[in-house]
Structure formats: structure tokens, C-alpha cells
Amino acid sequence: MFSNIVNKKLFQNSTTTSFLRHYSTIKNTTTSPKGFKTGTYACGLKKSGALDICLIHSEKECNVAAVFTENKVKAAPVLLSKSLIEKHKNTGFQSLIINSGGANACTGPEGEKNAQTMSFLSSKLVNAKQQSLVMSTGIIGQQLDMKKVELGITKASENLKDDWLSAAKAIMTTDKVPKLVQKQIEIQGKQVNITGICKGAGMIHPNMATMLCTLCTDADISEEALKSALKHSIDYSFNSINVDGDMSTNDTVAVFSNGLAGNKRIDSTNSKEYLLLEKAMRECATELAQMIVRDAEGATKFISVVVRGAKTEKDGKIIANSIATSSLVKTAMYGEDANWGRVLAAVGYSGADGVVPSNISMWFASGYGDNIGIGQKNDPLIAMQFLKDGQPTPKDDEKAAKLLSNKDISIIVDLNNGNQNYTMWTCDLTVDYVKANSHYRT
């Protein structure tokens, strides 16, 4: 365990090491999955005139797995895409059409018709056998200008190429930067590529938020194995982030696999090949999820909430979520105030069963990570302990404020009641967040 002030290694993967990282240098690479192309267009849905239509097409039919918002109020494209995947049993898809600048949510029969139009038109233009899946993002309750949308889809279909960066830009709303990851692995001697794009900066909460994400891979994997890989990928990525506790009507994560990498089809979820692909998908999803938190509306700090020693993983997740969604904790981090009492209160009211107050220890730390004591060289974690076995420890307010002035900080809570750990990523709550959301429609 930590002493009052210690240096420890902090687990860190190759994702994010500074606030908003090197977003300005994100670019297309040569590791795009075989057989996929993207087309984009600015049809005028956004007042800024920025790209707002994205069409993704595979030359070969794909297996698809997807997860959707758990909000009871679901947007028309969510309902349509979900029904198409169920109807076709996750197979035979070649295209996805996305618009930003309008959520097409709470738009009634007209909105449902517009989602169908987007689906049929885009699939027809790329000669796909099945309807396209559809995603939309933007303001809720406004009908899409379908003349603009149909023009945009047509233009995008005429300009299909290997340009994932433009695709990432086309789905942005309040995002400050595009979010794109590309990864290459080897399976059975074959080069397998994965590309992911996503958008999201507000209305972010576990079990999906105002977030759209598409992963495309040329791996050959069965639909059942693909569904399993996606589930495990999002459980510890998109379902482990929080910005403001609001859950959107449009959240969707979908993965397409066309098999053009040439590997032997992956059927078993116990195989070495499956585990390699799942790990790569999870790493892509984690990086994209953390990009969302770092790009959160008004955010100035990336916060890792690390719960250790939980009796069950469920308890760990419940407590991490309670801390990550606490407005008082988030504003304290913005103010660089080591108010550990707010964290302890969030633990207490979380509803988790395995909470024994006299067992709890707590640290605040500079740095980013999820497993204290495991990390890369030259990556020290500076931690200060504020609670030991349920009792406060002596603290130096000046040193604490300096520690919390870092852009990457960790809140570490050890329940000392088991061996399960859980990490959630969140951000601070700032004046700029209030400004951004009070003026969103204007």
C-alpha cells in the first residue's frame, strides 16, 4: 500500500498521456481495413458549413454487431438499425450512413420515414443488397431537412475513398477534435486491421451516452464471436466513462467485419485468435472512450476513478460510477480542492453492498491509469493519502493543491473488502460546461 506521499508505477497503455493529447496531429494511416471506403459531404445541416454526412461502405458483405442506448426514448435511426440487425441476424450488411446536425429523435412517423429514406437511398447508391444501418446525432426534436440529406448522401456515395479522418470529422457535433484510431495485428500470419471513429463530448454516461462509434475490421469472425468481442470491448471502455451523467437517445456502437484479411474464420471465443482480436478491439474502444472524456465539454482535467479491494466487481463499478457522477466531486477537482469527504460521501450513498467505512483508505494522485503498481518506466504516480482505515491522515493543503493542478489525476479508493478492482474515467465540471450547454441551441 501507499505511504502518505509515495512514488508508484501507474499502468498506462499507449492511449492518452496528456490532456487532449496529440489530437491536432491525428491523420489517416496505411493500416485501414481492406475493402472499406468512406464518403463525406457538407450538405448544410450544420450552420457552420462543416462536414455533416458520412457514408461507410464495404465491398464485401459484413457481419455486424451493435449495442444501442438504454434510454427508453430511442431515436428513429436507433430503432431502425436495431430492427435491421435483428431481422438479418447480424449478417449481410455493407453500408452505414451517418448524419450530424440533427438527432432525428422524438420526430414521430416523419422521422421514422426519414431514417428509412436514408437507409434505402444510401444502400441503393452503393449497390448494397441490404439496407444501410443509420446513425444520427444533433439536436433532439427537429425534423431533418431531407432535401439536404439526400443530396449529401448522393454526393458522399460519389466520393468513396480511404479517408477515415474526414469520416471522423463529419460525425462531430460539440466535439472539439475528431476521434480516430487505427490498429494492426497479426492473426495466423495474416495482417488484420481495425479502424474506429467516434463522436461525443457531452451527454456521456455509462451504458452508452450521446456517442456514436463505428469500428471496422477486415478480420474474418463469425457473427456470434463478433457480438461477444464487442460486448467485452465496451464493458471496459464506453461503459466506463462519464462526463455529465446524462444518457442520450441516439447512442450506438457498431462493428463491421468483412473477412478480407484472409485469416481462418474465428468461431470459438476461447481461441487464441479470438482473444487477440478482442484485445485489439478493446484497446481501440478504450482509446476512443478516453478521447471522449478528454474532449468533454468545458473539461480541464482527465480523472481516473480507481476502486480497489471491492467484494465484487459489481460493487466496484457501482462505487466508481457514484464518484464519477458526483457534481460535488467533479467541481472539487476543477477547483483543485482535495475535498476527500465528497468522495467518501459518494462511496457511502452509492448503494453498493460491500462498504465497511472503517476499512476504507483513499488517495488522490497525479497521473492517469487503472492499476496502481503496474506501469511503464518513467511513469511515476505521485499519490497523497487522505484516509486510512476510515480515519483522516495529516495532509498538506499546499502540496495537495499542487498535485491536483495536474491535467491527469486519479482518485483511488481501497475498500479493503475483497480483491475486485474497477476503473471509470471522468472529467471535472466547469463553468465552461455550463456555458456550452446553456447556449447549445443558439
Swiss-Prot record:
Subunit details for this protein?
A: Heterodimer of an alpha and a beta chain.
Asked if the Swiss-Prot or TrEMBL record annotates the protein with the keyword Transmembrane helix, the reply is no
Compartment list: Mitochondrion matrix
What's a Pfam family this protein contains? ArgJ
Q: Which organism is it from?
A: Dictyostelium discoideum
The record places the site described as Cleavage at 209-210
The Swiss-Prot or TrEMBL record describes its family as follows: Belongs to the ArgJ family.
Q: In the database record, which residues form the transit peptide?
A: 1-23
Name of the protein: Arginine biosynthesis bifunctional protein ArgJ, mitochondrial
